[in-house]
Structure formats: C-alpha cells, structure tokens
Amino acid sequence: MSLPKYPKTSTTERLGVLHIAAIFTEMGFIFREIPNSDTGIDGYIEEVNDNHETTARLLAVQIKSGKSYFNDQGEYFVYYADESHIKYWKLYPIPVILCIYNPETGYTYFQSIKCHSQDFSNKIYI
C-alpha cells in the first residue's frame, strides 16, 4: 500500500506565495493570503503609511511560481494567461498585479495586469 503523494507543484506554489509574502512584508505592507483559492487571485496587499497606519488601499495579487512561467523573449518575458482569467482580472474592482517567481534562480518579476487586460489578449509582457 502506498502513501498519499504531495506533488512537487504544490511545493513550488507554496514557495512562490511565501516568497512574495516575504517581499511585501519586508517593504512594510500587509500581505493577506487567500488560502486554497485558484480563481485568479492569491492574496491582497494593503498599504501601510509612514505613521504605521493601515490605509485601506489594496492590490490583488496573482502569483505564479516555477521555471515554466518564464517564457524568455530576449528583452522581456511573456506570461500566457487564459482568457477566463484575463476577463476576471479586468472585471476585478481593485488593481491586480501578477508576480512571477523562479525558485531555482530567486528571480521575481511584477507586472500590473489591469493595463494589459484592456484588449483581452492572453499575453502579459514582463
């Protein structure tokens, strides 16, 4: 009898969420993870001002973790989103950013999704 499996992709996903949370926490923001949500938003970032007051200003975050998300096009990367996610992000009531993390290299890139979702193209240039 075999034991339950924990796929490597689950480890890679968790590494990405934890890495992004650490970056924003170190910057003084509040990172709120949405547990077990795969609808296109992995968490929220709330701004904290210089007086250490929360501001109620939020960003939604979509996190992608893994080498496979780095489609190198020379001077930039392209992330190919499916049409349903692009539509979802466009309709989202607050700004959405895409965070792509490569745990093998430690490279992390951020891009506003709102500015790329106007034409419903599935390409997001990073």
Model-derived segments and spans:
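Mixed-charge (Asp/Glu-Lys/Arg
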Residues: 1-39, 45-126
